[in-house]
Structure formats: structure tokens, C-alpha cells
Amino acid sequence: MVTENTISSERATPVTFTVPNTTPVTKTPEWQALVAHATQAKGTTIKDLFRDDPGRAGDMTFDAGPLHVDLSKNLADENTLRLLTNVARAMGIENYRQSMFNGEHINTTEDRAVLHTALRIPIEQDMTVDGQDVAEDVHGVLGRMRDLARALRKGDWRGVTNHTIKNVVNIGIGGSDLGPAMAAKALRPYCTAGITPYFVSNVDPSDITSTLDGLDPESTLFVVSSKTFTTSETLANAHAAKRWLLRELGHTGVDVKDDAVVKDAVAKHFVAVSTNAEAVAEFGIDTRNMFGFWDWVGGRYSVDSAIGLSLMAAIGPRDFMEFVGGFHEVDNHFYSEPLEMNVPVLMGLLGVWYTSVLGSQSHLVLPYSDDLADFPSYLQQLMMESNGKSRRLNGDLTTVETGEVYWGAQGTNGQHAFMQLIHQGTHLIPTDFIGFVNPHTDAVASDGETSMHDMLLSNFLAQSRVMAFGRDEDEVREAGVEEELVPHKVMPGNRPSTTIVADKLTPRTLGALIALYEHIAFVQGVVWGINSFDQWGVELGKKQANELLPKLGANNGGADVSTGDSSTDSLTKHILRNRRR
């Protein structure tokens, strides 16, 4: 269930947002003190920090909802964290946080509120944004989602041939796909009602073709997720899905030449997550089966909105509300805890420390759970689309490096792929380890006794330990290694990491984990002075793709394919010359 609310409900209708501090972070005395500290601390190792402070692990471990977070293996001491929180305060983090939760328009380039946190507020909470009762709206949509999910799971929703629905295919892209797809895989043990979710996003036709191959059209429902219902990739896949549905239904005896039958088939096999009722109706979807969301919810922050409809259908309304409750727990923690004990704040500031002070270029995420295999990809959009910016809010260039390149894979696979570079390479790559005390399933290893989950956890603990403390020459020699191999087997250590542990990968835990990184992105954006909630680079790419598309069309008739640059011109001509229609 959604947890008890501790965020203040006494919030006024938002006023025009005023940026708390317009000074570049590098011009603040707090930043200069941080840089001076970095110079002074140069050469200090993680091993030194543990040696000098026996209580370090206890002092730097915190709980945020169901998440137990150990920051002690980072290249930072209490003084570093104090200086970082001073920087955050100087940049107005507390006022910014309040403004976000108040529904003020902190997305300044689009003049919008940023209120993904409102997606998980209790219905009794009083929150009005731009004159609209947010809690009532949110729970109204959740109620309609719940009704549809229950109808699907109970077999009350029937296709045009009266078959129950067994397959739910979500068609979207970006935030309309990555979140629900990741969450559906992460929560596979909770998909118990015979509803199998599928996800189509890529405009590459092989994506939808391979997904639909083998599915029964009579038992398949499509969820078309596009706020504007104009996203080109999503609409291309939606129309391909409609053609497939009608073709395959025709093979079962459905009269797909009868317009009334076609209308009925589309209405019973398609629903929409959108706000464009006219376009939804034009496609053929009954607007009573359209689920909306709001311009104060960015796509990459929308998995717990109607965008999660396919997820709710798969795991059920009760577990979906547990998922939402996990978000809310971390929202409460982020809103109410002092900066010095606030996990999203501290993790976000450590990212600033590594990126903008110590020169790190990327951030590795290693979930030791196969169910969480897609979590690093999800974080790529959340973190990189949010903070991949080089302009401050006033339009000036940033004065520090911003944004972290997120990447990763599930453990232990990553150990046999890229961990060599982490342990003995030359790059500084802070790492987040994510593990779970209890598995959903377990098995024994080849000896017939050892738990495979224990094997997983032993690797989980060992990797962060080797990263932090390494192995010096004396230890290598003590292990009996031949002298000429000693330098090759030295592990320098001093590789920073954060360890996140939860009891089990449940809907609640996953919601908390996502909310943690949502707030990390926010904290970093405030310190860097950028807008974490627009994505103009993505928009320009869409525009130019639409301009290039006619030049690649089958009916271009030898028309001019000039694009304005010789490279794109040459590539376009090469494609046209070698195309086989």
C-alpha cells in the first residue's frame, strides 16, 4: 500500500519560480573551498580513510525506505561531504526542492511544473497546481487503470472473437517504453495472472515483427503510449500492429472487409495512453479507453503514471500500488531528511564530486540481479537525458563538466566483460553495486550444497572490496606469485563505489530504487545550474529525421537529395543506389 504521507500538504498555489542562485557554482566560495580540499586530499586513498576512521562504515551508511546504502567506499571523508553539502546549500538546493514539491514551474525552458512526485501522493493530500486538484486527477487515472487491469486479469475484457486477453503489447519509445519494460522484467515473479507483457519501441521493423511472431491476435491487446499521439516511431509501430491484427484476424474468419467489424476489432484490441483524444479517435481507439497524464510529468519520470498501464496489467493493481508506495517512501526521505543524512542528496553530490572536481567521465551500475538487467539502460535515459546539458538556466555555458555517462550490466556477467578495466585500467569510474539479501528463487551449485544466491552475493561483496582496497606487491608475493608476474597481479584499489542493499526485489523496492535516482538527477542539476527536465537535443534529432525521410522515399523520383552537408548527401545517395525494393 501507499505509505503514510509525511510531506507537508499545506502548499499554496504555485507562484512564478525564481532561481534561488544564478551565480555559476564555480564562483561561489563554497565551491572554491571544495576544490582546495580536493588538492589537499590528493593522494589519500580509501584504504587510508578506513585506517584513520574505524567507525567510517557505520557513519557513512544510511537507510532510505527499504534501501540500505553504504557510501563508505567512496573517495570522500566527512569533510568532503560537509563541503559538498555547503555547495548544495549555496546553490539553493533546499529552496529548489521545496519549489519542486510545491508545483512551481522549475522547468524554466518549457514553463512547466515538475511533479512526478505527485504521481504517488495519497488521495487525501491537498495539492493544487495551476488551479487543478492534482491528487484527485492522479487517483482518478489510477482508478481507471485499476478497472482495466482487473478486467484483463479476470478475463472480463474480451477481444472481438470473445477470447480473453493473454498478451499485452506496449508500443512506445523513450520514457513510454524504457520504464515499463525495465519494471516488467524486474518484477517477473509478480506476473502471475497469465498476462504476458511485451514491449515494442524501435522503428526498425524487425522489433515489432519478432515481437508479434507467434502471438495469437485473438488474445492480444495493444497499449499505444504517446502523450501527443504524434510520435513518429510509435505511430509507425501502432499502424503496423493494426495491419497485423486485421490480417491475422482475417485468417480466423473475422470479416475484416466490413468497416463496422474493423472498428469493433480495433476498439477491443487497442487502448491508448495519451492526451490527444482527436488523434486517438482517428486511429480507431475508443476514447473511453484513453488514459491521460500531464505536462508536469516528463517521459523519463512517468513509469508510475498511466505509462505503467501494461505493467499494472501484468503485476496487478495491488502490487502496482506497492510499487508506487516505494517511490513515495523515498520522496518522503528526500523531502524531510537533512542534507547530511539524505541519501539522494549525498549520492548526487558524490556524482558532482567525481565528475566536476576529480574528472570522472562515466558511472557504472551493477545490479546483482538478473531481473534488474535492464536497469542500467533505464538509468541511461533518466540520468543522461536529464543532465546531458552544457547551458545554464540563463543560457550561459556551464563552467564545470556536467552529466555522467551511465552504463552497466547485471553481475556477475559484468565481471567477465569489463571489470578488468575497472580494477587495473587508468579510468576513474565510480560504481553503484545493487544487491538483494533474499532471492525469489534459489538453487544449489555443483557441489550440491552451496546456494547459488550466496555465490552471487559473495561476488557482489568481493568486487566492491577489491575495488576499494586492491592488493599490493607484498600481498601478491605472499600468495606465492612468481616475481616477474608480481606487477601484473597488483590491484591498485582506490576505485570508489556505493553499495545499495535491499531485502528483496519487490515492487516496493523497485519503486524506491527508481525514485532514488530520480532525485539524484535533480540534485546534480541544481548544483550544475542546468535544467534537468527538458531535452532539446532529442527534439532537434526528431525534426531533422522528419526532413530527411522524404529524400529516402520510394517515390522521390530522382528529386534533389541535398541536405546541406556533403557527408549526409553522400550517404543518402549511397543508400538510394544500393536499395533493393
What are these regions (language model features)?
Residues 166-172, 222-228, 362-369, 405-406, ...:
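Short glycine-rich or small-residue beta-strand-to-loop segments that form or flank ligand, phosphate
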Residues 407-504:
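Helicase-primase coupling helices
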Residues 491-495, 499-528, 533, 540, ...:
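C-terminal accessory domains/tails appended to large, multi-domain proteins
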Residues 247-443, 493, 540-546, 555-581:
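Active-site phosphate/pyrophosphate-binding segments
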Residues 147-155, 162-337:
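Glycine-rich phosphate-binding loops that contact phosphosugars or nucleotide phosphates
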Residues 2, 7, 11-92, 345-357, ...:
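Flexible, glycine-rich loop/tail regions that form catalytic "lids" or insertion modules at the edges
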Residues 29, 55, 75, 79, ...:
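Conserved active-site and cofactor/substrate-binding residues in soluble primary-metabolism enzymes
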Residues 19-30, 35-161, 450-452, 457, ...:
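Extended, charge-enriched "interface" segments that sit outside catalytic cores
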